């Protein structure tokens, strides 16, 4: 991308605003090196990435990027053996914490169902160095000092230092409080010179205290003396301080070596958080300028809906719809100067540059933009004083360069094409230049005030006229772009509003050809038609938005209704299942009683006992089952029944075997130890195939129930989860399952570790592994059973 294009389209000013939203020098460095890309896939990915960060901001308000600094030079110094200072080590620890915190932040959102595939990939590259981080913070305090607890030796040395300092101060303070002190001392204070404790002694009493003179006042009347009685104590103190310094250096070297070992990982983490800072800066900037994600196409057309210039206050600027590349490849904006034509031109250019840089652009949703390999712009008066070039010559030098390089993958922006020379020749040149660029397939937006170019838009298939609306009543441009309507000067209307007499204006009209007057009148009618059409469109758009709002409200109500309905159905189902479970338990109790009767050698159970047992079985079934109508389609009459056939007795939900037919509609059926008469309408023939696949059903205490092939533990407390795993594995073994899956999610990893620790000890487990990509990855453990 040409540097001149970036400059005239004020790309660097956008970058300056973007810089304000970075959280660290790492992100700022990324912004400073930002340039538009020309790779379609890269641009799409950058836009998607910015959109994910914008989603995070919408949901959370911010991202935890605090505490991150550029530690790359410090890490590289550690790598070559230089000792790092406490503050440098603390910066490394803080940055490691910041990267770890950012990783956890994104992963927590993903675990809660927020789809962030690109950001999730970014944070997956961050490697936690918690142990190193804690070693540093355990040794270095928040103020950058090495703390006493950094080592036992350092704690002992500092205890010695504090003891020595206390003894020295005590002796010196006794001296300053003595009866002669006021006479011999300049002041009753204890101070420090050359890291040794001293007292201020008057010049004439220097020999009283003995010791060493370390300093004197500016007047020479006061000497700062270390009295002889504390010289040994001060010496001991200095020795302890030397030991302290040596121990601190040892600790810092040890920590520096730890950093050097993990240097490559630390630098990799820094690169990831630098990218994250950069990504979120783009998202915050999008929020600031009310920008949206454009649809990026490779079809060489753009559709900017309600586009605004990002550097102009959104409350002031008038948004415009700008389309280019489908029905027409060139827009020629005509009309007088100071009408906002240049702003429109720059809006197109800066939106393209921003989109190709991965920035969201200030447009409405569903706007589309394409990728250009080159963007050329000839905007403004950039004549060169050094080269003694006129305005026209300066523009022409730039245009010649554009004509040499422009092709079908280029966007070309011309401001006041052909200006600065004779109007007739300038207009002719402008037409010729536009033809040349259009023939090369480039997309072109050009502004001009030459009336000759109004006809140009009608004489070329791929060219359309446009103008910026002017309000004659207020004598000011509205900055509203009118596609399909050429501009007009409005000179007569403006002059009339300013007080010029009608006579002079009428005479002026006579100097203009009839054809020109007709064209001006036609343009005025086009403007009026455009306004009416736009007003109708705005009304239709308002109705559409109102309909969408109503539709969303109805959808919300339907969803709420369905949720309430489902909740009630689930509740009713749960209650029904509880009743059925209670009935099954009651039935098991009855069967157990009958078995006990049989064990008591009462082989012939009396009729009244059977009747009583049968009625109790029927009474144990809940009302839900009793009232259920038998489905005639599945009943036995469709199958020719024979003695020995296996059937299901629908009333009890139990299997039985046909003994003999006792009437046209009844059979004698053996159900366990019971023998009873059952109507054919209450039976269902069981067709047992020769080879049957193993069903996911286990039988426990005469009870059939379904065992799932997977166990979902997400959201469970650790203790409850372990209890469920134990029961589930037992049930799965009873069901003869060869393989099952346990879903524990990714999260912090505690539940996953707990599950796998348990599996290692379980006798029924053959092997286990993480799930493959299609099975749930690290969030699932697949278990092979013996």
From Swiss-Prot:
Kindly list the GO molecular function terms attached to this UniProt entry. ATP binding; ATP hydrolysis activity; ATP-dependent DNA damage sensor activity; endonuclease activity; mismatched DNA binding; ribosomal large subunit binding; rRNA binding
The protein's Enzyme Commission number: 3.1.-.-, 3.6.4.-
Q: What are the recorded Gene Ontology BP terms?
A: mismatch repair; negative regulation of DNA recombination; rescue of stalled ribosome
Taxonomic superkingdom: Bacteria
Binding-site positions, ATP:
335-342
Q: Which UniProt keywords apply?
A: ATP-binding, DNA-binding, Endonuclease, Hydrolase, Nuclease, Nucleotide-binding, RNA-binding, rRNA-binding
KW Cytoplasm (keyword) present: no
**Matching InterPro entries:** DNA_mismatch_repair_MutS_C (IPR000432), DNA_mismatch_repair_MutS_core (IPR007696), DNA_mismatch_repair_MutS_sf (IPR036187), MSSS (IPR046893), MutS (IPR045076), MutS2 (IPR005747), P-loop_NTPase (IPR027417), Smr_dom (IPR002625)
Q: Where is the Smr domain?
A: 711-786
SMART domains cross-referenced by the UniProt entry:
MUTSac (SM00534), MUTSd (SM00533), SMR (SM00463)
Q: According to its UniProt record, what is one Pfam family this protein matches?
A: MutS_V
What does the sequence similarity comment in the record state about its family? Belongs to the DNA mismatch repair MutS family. MutS2 subfamily.
Function in brief: Endonuclease that is involved in the suppression of homologous recombination and thus may have a key role in the control of bacterial genetic diversity.
Listed PANTHER family:
OS10G0509000 PROTEIN, OS10G0509000 PROTEIN-RELATED
Quaternary context: Homodimer. Binds to stalled ribosomes, contacting rRNA.
Protein name per Swiss-Prot or TrEMBL? Endonuclease MutS2
- What is the name of the gene encoding this protein? mutS2
């Amino acid at each position: 991308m040409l540097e001149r294009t970036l400059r005239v389209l004020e790309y660097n000013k956008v970058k300056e605003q973007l810089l304000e939203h970075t959280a660290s020098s790492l992100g700022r460095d990324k912004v400073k090196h930002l340039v538009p890309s020309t790779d379609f896939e890269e641009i799409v990915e950058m836009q998607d990435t910015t959109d994910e960060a914008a989603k995070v901001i919408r949901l959370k308000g911010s991202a935890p990027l605090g505490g991150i600094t550029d530690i790359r030079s410090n890490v590289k110094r550690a790598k070559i053996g230089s000792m790092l200072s406490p503050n440098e080590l603390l910066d490394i620890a803080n940055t490691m914490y910041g990267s770890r915190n950012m990783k956890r932040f994104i992963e927590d959102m993903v675990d809660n169902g927020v789809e962030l595939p690109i950001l999730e990939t970014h944070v997956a590259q961050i490697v936690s160095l918690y142990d190193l981080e804690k070693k540093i913070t355990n040794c270095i305090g928040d103020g950058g000092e090495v703390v006493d607890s950094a080592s036992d030796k350092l704690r002992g040395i500092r205890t010695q230092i504090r003891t020595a300092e206390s003894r020295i101060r005590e002796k010196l303070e006794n001296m300053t409080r003595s009866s002669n002190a006021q006479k011999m001392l300049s002041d009753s204070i204890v101070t420090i010179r050359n890291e040794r404790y001293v007292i201020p002694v008057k010049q004439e009493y220097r020999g009283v205290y003995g010791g060493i003179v370390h300093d004197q006042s500016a007047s020479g009347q006061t000497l700062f003396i270390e009295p002889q009685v504390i010289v040994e104590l001060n010496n001991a103190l200095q020795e302890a301080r030397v030991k302290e310094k040596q121990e601190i250096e040892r600790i810092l070297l040890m920590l520096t070596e730890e950093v050097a070992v993990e240097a490559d990982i630390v630098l990799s983490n820094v690169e990831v958080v630098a990218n994250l800072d950069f990504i979120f800066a783009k998202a915050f900037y999008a929020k600031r300028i009310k920008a949206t994600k454009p649809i990026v196409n490779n079809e060489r057309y753009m559709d900017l809906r309600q586009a605004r210039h990002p550097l102009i206050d959104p409350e002031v600027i008038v948004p415009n719809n700008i389309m280019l590349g489908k029905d027409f490849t060139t827009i020629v904006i005509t009309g007088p100067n100071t009408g906002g034509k240049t702003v429109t031109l720059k809006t197109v250019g800066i939106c393209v540059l921003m989109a190709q840089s991965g920035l969201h652009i200030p447009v409405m949703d569903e706007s589309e933009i394409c990728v250009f390999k080159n963007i050329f712009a000839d905007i403004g008066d950039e004549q060169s004083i050094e080269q003694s070039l006129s305005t026209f010559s300066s523009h022409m030098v730039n245009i010649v360069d554009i004509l040499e390089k422009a092709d079908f993958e280029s966007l070309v922006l011309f401001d006041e094409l052909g200006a600065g020379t004779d109007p007739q020749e300038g207009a002719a040149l402008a037409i010729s230049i536009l033809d040349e660029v259009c023939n090369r397939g480039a997309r072109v937006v050009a502004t001009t005030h030459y009336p000759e170019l109004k006809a140009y838009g009608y004489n070329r298939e791929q060219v359309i006229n446009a103008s910026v609306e002017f309000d004659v009543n207020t004598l000011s441009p509205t900055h509203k772009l009118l596609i399909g309507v050429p501009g007009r000067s409005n000179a007569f209307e403006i002059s009339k509003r300013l007080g010029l007499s009608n006579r002079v204006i009428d005479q002026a009209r006579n100097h203009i050809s009839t054809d020109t007057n007709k064209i001006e009148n036609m343009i005025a009618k086009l403007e009026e038609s455009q306004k009416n059409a736009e007003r109708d469109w705005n009304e239709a758009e308002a109705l559409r938005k109102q309909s969408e709002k109503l539709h969303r409200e109805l959808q919300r109500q339907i969803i709420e209704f369905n949720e309430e309905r489902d909740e009630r159905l689930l509740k009713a189902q749960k209650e029904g299942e509880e009743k059925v479970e209670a009935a099954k338990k009651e039935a098991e109790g009855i069967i157990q009683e009958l078995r006990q009767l049989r064990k008591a050698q009462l082989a012939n159970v009396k009729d009244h006992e059977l009747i009583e047992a049968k009625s109790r079985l029927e009474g144990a079934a809940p009302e839900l089952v009793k009232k259920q109508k038998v489905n005639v389609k599945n009943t036995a009459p469709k199958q020719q029944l024979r003695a020995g056939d296996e059937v299901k007795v629908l009333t009890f939900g139990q299997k039985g075997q046909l003994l003999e037919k006792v009437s046209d509609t009844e059979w004698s059926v053996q159900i366990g130890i019971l023998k009873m008469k059952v109507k054919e309408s209450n039976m269902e023939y069981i067709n047992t195939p020769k080879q049957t696949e193993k069903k996911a059903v286990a039988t426990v205490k005469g009870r059939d129930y379904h065992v799932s092939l997977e166990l979902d533990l997400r959201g469970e407390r650790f203790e409850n989860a372990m209890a469920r795993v134990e029961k589930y594995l037992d049930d799965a073994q009873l069901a003869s399952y060869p393989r099952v899956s346990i879903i524990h999610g990714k999260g912090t990893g505690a539940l996953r570790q707990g599950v796998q620790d348990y599996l290692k000890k379980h006798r029924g487990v053959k092997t286990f592994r993480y799930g493959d990509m299609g099975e749930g990855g690290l969030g699932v453990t697949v278990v092979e059973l013996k």
